[in-house]
């Protein structure tokens, strides 16, 4: 924890930090703003405030139901003198690629051939909503296999990807 400069990690009881960070549902506040946002301070109360949030869903959670539960909850806790407007955007169902799937096992063999070792099966939350549609509508499972490294800093300002790895995975 010293590497990320925190004293302790908290979260859902009964689950490890790895589980909470990868395969459990999450609610994330992506941004909050309102009132004066320039440099310096102001003693003005904002007339409006905004927030952007997202949720990681897991299998058997319906994005429309979860979205409505969120809207209902926010409206239920808002004081009567506060106007609340919640605008649901888009969503998709949760999906897990079974590692027992023949297509996964074939990809695993190709990975081992290209990289000299089997991939580590790790569940990671992500947003590819059409994957669950493939299963529900077309009746097919989709293999999801990442080729990046932790050092790639995916979705960060310093995101990068190794050219050596990208060339290696073309041999799968």
Regions found by a protein language model. Give the residues of each.
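Conserved small/polar residues in nucleotide/adenosyl-binding loops
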Residues: 170-171
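Metal-dependent amide/peptide-bond hydrolase catalytic core
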Residues: 1-160, 164
């Amino acid at each position: 924890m010293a590497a990320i400069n925190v004293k302790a990690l908290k979260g859902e009881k009964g689950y490890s930090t790895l589980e909470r960070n990868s395969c459990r549902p999450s609610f994330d506040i992506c941004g909050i703003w309102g009132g004066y946002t320039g440099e310096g301070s102001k003693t003005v109360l904002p007339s409006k405030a905004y927030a952007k949030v997202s949720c990681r869903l897991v299998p058997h959670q319906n994005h429309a139901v979860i979205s409505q539960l969120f809207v209902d909850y926010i409206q239920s806790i808002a004081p009567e003198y506060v106007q609340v407007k919640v605008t649901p955007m888009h969503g998709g169902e949760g999906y897990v690629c079974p590692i027992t799937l023949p297509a996964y096992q074939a990809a695993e063999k190709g990975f081992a051939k290209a990289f000299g070792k089997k991939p580590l099966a790790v569940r990671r939350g992500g947003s590819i909503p059409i994957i669950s549609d493939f299963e529900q509508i077309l009746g097919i499972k989709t293999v999801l296999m990442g080729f990046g490294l932790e050092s790639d800093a995916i979705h960060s300002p310093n995101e990068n990807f190794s050219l050596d790895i990208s060339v290696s995975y073309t041999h799968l």
